[in-house]
Regions:
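SAM-dependent transferase fold signal centered on methyltransferase-like domains
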Residues: 1-344
Length: 344
């Protein structure tokens, strides 16, 4: 074995599950797999036998090489950002988001100018990630994607995120993904019964749809207008060994193609979800549920609820149960709310 390097298995992301199972007893104890360019890089603590090597090369399309251990995500204790700034003496962002093996920073402090790389290296080491990216252009358009600049680390914006027992492959430069909704996705998934038909109107890479299918076994139809999200959703269905119906296009039009009356509709598009309620109501069965996600200040929520009630009533339907929940604070005094409706 060469000095100061680790043996690494590199293979296509679609073979992730088989690779992890096959290499479990050989996997490194302190280094985690890395993801880049639609491939997984699995560091090993010891070489597998000849039979295993032949299997992963022939059946999983793998290659074996040697790489520096420093480039891999680490299994380690993370220091809070507030404590980190005190200990390292460089300006640290107030918040950062872990997605798979990368760290996302929305904004750097003003004092960070000229020290971006230094800050990136500090964050890279503290969080034990493959790369750190800074948002340089806000989410825009109906596809909700942003532009990112790499502060430190290696590889591209592709990663694989583990959440609620599921794998989600994604590219942050091509799709929208919010890991902070992990608990909310579990809350909704645990409400779904096996005999339901669920429509996810803005499904992204499938975190709601795939988890619901995996936990409940219900029929699920997932819609998204972003072609990249649809491709990732198809891959993620395979990674998680579930089968869901996937439609690409404008949810207002595609929802007419679902083929069944929905028992539950998920509308996770906080910027514009209310605009799509007309379309959702048209396929919702009696006593069905709609989960509408909206951005709102506390003092604006009541008017949003009245607006939703008016839309439902315009279709000669009646809301028989309504409640709202705070999901996440997105800026001072502005939140993502989920408005839960049951409609007769």
């Amino acid at each position: 074995m060469p000095e100061n390097v680790v043996e690494v298995v590199i293979l296509p992301i679609e073979n992730l599950n088989k690779a992890l199972a096959t290499l479990a007893k050989y996997s490194h104890k302190t280094l985690k797999p890395a993801f880049s360019e639609y491939k997984v890089y699995i560091p090993l603590r010891e070489s597998p036998g000849r039979n295993v090597v032949d299997f992963i090369k022939q059946e999983l399309n793998a290659e074996i090489t040697w790489m520096l251990p420093d480039i891999f995500p680490k299994r380690k204790q993370i220091i809070s950002l507030k404590k980190l700034e005190k200990s390292v003496g460089v300006p640290i962002p107030k918040s950062a988001t872990l997605v798979g093996d990368i760290l996302l920073v929305n904004k750097l402090p003003e004092a960070a100018q000229g020290r971006e790389y230094e800050i990136g290296k500090v964050l890279l080491k503290n969080f034990g990630v493959r790369a750190v990216f800074l948002k340089v252009e806000k989410f825009n358009g109906i596809q909700r994607v942003a532009s990112w600049h790499k502060l430190a680390g290696w590889g591209d914006t592709f990663t694989v995120h583990r959440e609620n027992g599921c794998w989600f492959s994604l590219d942050i430069s091509k799709v929208f993904f919010n890991p902070r909704l992990s608990n909310e996705r579990l809350v909704i998934a645990e409400r779904v019964e096996r005999d339901e038909f669920v429509v996810d109107m803005f499904a992204g890479v499938g975190p709601f749809a795939i988890l619901i299918k995996k936990l409940s076994g219900a029929q699920v139809c997932a819609i998204d207008i972003n072609k990249h999200a649809v491709e990732f959703m198809k891959l993620n269905s395979k990674l998680n060994k579930v089968s869901i119906s996937i439609l690409e296009g404008d949810a207002r039009l595609k929802i007419a193609e679902v083929g069944y009356e929905a028992s539950r509709i998920i509308m996770n598009y906080p910027e514009r979800s209310i605009e799509f309620i007309d379309s959702a109501i048209s396929v919702l069965r009696s006593y069905g549920f709609i989960h509408v996600y909206v951005f709102s200040r506390v003092d604006e929520l009541e008017s949003l609820v009245h607006r939703i009630e008016d839309i439902v009533q315009s279709h000669d339907r009646k809301i028989i149960n309504l409640s709202s929940r705070v999901i996440e604070e997105v800026s001072p005094r502005r939140y993502i709310y989920c408005i839960d409706l049951q409609v007769l």
